[in-house]
């Protein structure tokens, strides 16, 4: 399903393999760079896959030889798969390009989405993504990851929000290169089912905040 407003086209792509999604990102990116179309966001789920950003160290990777796709985003290694909502915003940033400000907008959008479900989440200084703060259940836990690239003033890659995914996939890696914190999901924190289908309309409502006024 595709939703188009004057400022943004949102494409619900369903379940899409990582390589196919990457091809679609690049196609949209070229069109936005060439001014052939406006900003767009792909929303989807991936079949289970590990992807490694440019700062991934050898010891961050799975020890059991599980395949990893190396990608040109920032950050380190992470997992994508069923039960996780992935968003790839393809947006033209205003000049001068401020990547940090854009990442902060993505973080705030996801913080606001979590709040709608009743989960208090926020930032941790020096770490990207959206976090549930440390409490009596354990150390700080990441509920949403962010990995961005900007090429010719237009964004690529994006964010992933853990809804009700199998968190044991993270046990094989050092997720995002951070060994002293955990990973969580909306369902795990709230103690009730929160599916990708539940999260989709909430995320869609908040996506326009990524476009700088």
From Swiss-Prot:
Substrate binds at residues 73-80, 145-147, 158-160. It holds the Pfam family LplA-B_cat. Transmembrane segments: none annotated. Its EC number is 2.3.1.181. GO terms for biological process: protein modification process. It comes from the Bacteria. It catalyses: octanoyl-[ACP] + L-lysyl-[protein] = N(6)-octanoyl-L-lysyl-[protein] + holo-[ACP] + H(+). Keywords: Acyltransferase, Cytoplasm, Transferase. GO terms for cellular component: cytoplasm. SUPFAM superfamilies: Class II aaRS and biotin synthetases. The record marks 142 as: Lowers pKa of active site Cys. It is found in: Cytoplasm. The active site is at 176 (acyl-thioester intermediate). The keyword 4Fe-4S does not apply. The keyword Acyltransferase applies. GO terms for molecular function: lipoyl(octanoyl) transferase activity. It is an enzyme of class 2 (transferase). Residues 35-213 form the BPL/LPL catalytic domain. PROSITE patterns: BPL_LPL_CATALYTIC (PS51733), LIPB (PS01313). PANTHER family: LIPOYLTRANSFERASE 2, MITOCHONDRIAL-RELATED (PTHR10993:SF7), OCTANOYLTRANSFERASE (PTHR10993). Catalyzes the transfer of endogenously produced octanoic acid from octanoyl-acyl-carrier-protein onto the lipoyl domains of lipoate-dependent enzymes. Lipoyl-ACP can also act as a substrate although octanoyl-ACP is likely to be the physiological substrate. In the reaction, the free carboxyl group of octanoic acid is attached via an amide linkage to the epsilon-amino group of a specific lysine residue of lipoyl domains of lipoate-dependent enzymes. This is Octanoyltransferase. It comes from Salinispora tropica (strain ATCC BAA-916 / DSM 44818 / JCM 13857 / NBRC 105044 / CNB-440).
């Amino acid at each position: 399903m595709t939703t188009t407003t004057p400022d943004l086209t949102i494409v619900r792509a369903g379940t899409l393999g990582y390589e196919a999604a990457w091809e679609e990102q690049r196609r949209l990116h070229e069109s936005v760079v060439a001014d052939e179309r406006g900003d767009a966001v792909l929303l989807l789920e991936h079949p289970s896959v590990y992807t490694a950003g440019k700062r991934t160290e050898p010891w961050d990777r799975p020890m059991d030889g599980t395949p990893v796709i190396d990608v040109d985003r920032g950050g380190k290694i992470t997992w994508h798969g069923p039960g996780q909502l992935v968003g790839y915003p393809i947006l033209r940033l205003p000049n001068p390009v401020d990547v940090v400000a854009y990442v902060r907008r993505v973080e705030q959008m996801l913080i606001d989405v979590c709040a709608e479900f009743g989960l208090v989440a926020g930032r941790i200084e020096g770490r990207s993504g959206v976090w549930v703060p440390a409490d009596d259940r354990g150390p700080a836990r990441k509920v949403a990851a962010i990995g961005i690239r900007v090429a010719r003033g237009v964004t690529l890659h994006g964010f992933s929000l853990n809804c009700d995914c199998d968190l044991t996939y993270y046990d094989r890696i050092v997720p995002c290169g951070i060994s002293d914190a955990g990973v969580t999901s909306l369902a795990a924190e709230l103690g009730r089912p929160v599916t990708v289908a539940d999260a989709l309309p909430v995320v869609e409502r908040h996506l326009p905040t990524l476009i700088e006024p």
